[in-house]
């Protein structure tokens, strides 16, 4: 699978918009999840929640799991996806990685969510994940970022099955 992530931070006081883009890796458990969904089966893991983290692997890998990360504190972490997600052909104009054959997950953080400081990694897992629970994907930000009480944020996680 080819995959990308996009973070959009919007300062509600100044109107400034900051966009951070990068690549993430689908884990082995994530490959299984997508295969089961494609076959109409109930997935072994009910991946849905986005976990923001202050530390994680130097290089994301196929075998990463919950224990490889330091999950951040803050209100609404982990976060459920926006209603209607995941979906294909996302029409949110901030999701520049969307497309017909791309599965997009969207997570929106309001001013009241957080605060989150020094976020360097994130992943999608099940609600209440802990220990060595499996994760769908593993992502390392190109640089740390903060979300304070004057900011909203949108996180898009995009996955494209390349068929190879």
What are these regions (language model features)?
Residues 1-120, 126-164:
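Small cysteine-rich, disulfide-bonded extracellular modules of the LU/uPAR three-finger superfamily
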């Amino acid at each position: 699978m080819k995959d990308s992530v996009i973070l959009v931070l919007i300062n509600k006081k100044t109107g400034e918009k900051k966009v951070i883009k990068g690549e993430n890796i689908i884990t082995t458990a994530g490959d299984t999840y997508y295969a089961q969904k494609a076959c109409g089966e109930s997935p072994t893991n009910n991946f849905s929640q986005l976990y923001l983290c202050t530390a994680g692997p130097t290089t994301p890998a196929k075998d990463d799991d919950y224990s490889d990360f330091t999950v951040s504190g803050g209100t609404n972490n982990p976060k459920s996806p926006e209603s209607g997600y995941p979906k294909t052909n996302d029409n949110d104009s901030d999701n520049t990685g969307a497309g017909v054959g791309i599965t997009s997950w969207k997570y929106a953080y309001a001013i009241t969510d957080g605060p989150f400081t020094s976020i360097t990694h994130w992943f999608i897992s099940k609600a209440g994940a802990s220990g060595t629970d499996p994760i769908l994907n593993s992502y390392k930000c190109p640089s740390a970022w903060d979300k304070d009480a004057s900011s909203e944020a949108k996180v898009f996680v995009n996955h494209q099955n390349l068929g190879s």
